[in-house]
Amino acid sequence: MIDTNWAIHGREFVNCNCSYGCPCQFNGLPTHGHCRAVAGMEIEQGHHGATKLDGLKFVAIFRWPGAIHEGKGEAAVVVDERATEVQRGALLRIICGQDTKPGATIFNVFASTLEKLHDPIFAPIDFQVDVAGRQARLVVPGVTEGRGEPILNPVTGAPHRVRIDMPDGFEYTLAEIGRGWTKTGGPIKFELADTYAQFAEIHLCQNGIVR
């Protein structure tokens, strides 16, 4: 039984090591057989019980040796340094998949695939995202630095717009697809260049996507 109700409504930017289409979005295997990803999110409105989460940001860095569903992954979470102690605890419970119906959110699903969760990092997060424009910037000094851009037509150079519609998903219902570059430091190190990126509006609660 879930004792605490929560909800977050905001925008995300995700960059992983797959090619532009990311087979994982279609229950395929990752492009290179393993997964590396960084996700940033800003909560426009949110709460965990009576604790307000409006305006806070967080970042999650992931690494799996194979496909996500095969497990053995590790993660590092960065929480907005502006959050109070109570807000930090609330965000970590949500991000770590607690207080959630099993399998209902990406946080809960991903948590079930991890064998190592590094100590949380509390730091300033520079995060800007334009979902419709497929533009993003995500910087946590010493931890991660990345950006997102539209895919370009190889012949004309014009922006190429593609979306993924996932009505029964556990993260988003509609995502704009682009490309991204990321370099991470800290406990999980890797570099991505011109790989899959998604930009989406997120509205989740303890029971999954809010529709």
Cite the ranges covered by each PLM segment:
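Charged linear interaction tracts used for macromolecular binding and regulation
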Residues: 73, 77-160
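Extended, charged low-complexity segments
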Residues: 151-211
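Generic structural motif
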Residues: 21-23, 44-48, 82, 132, ...
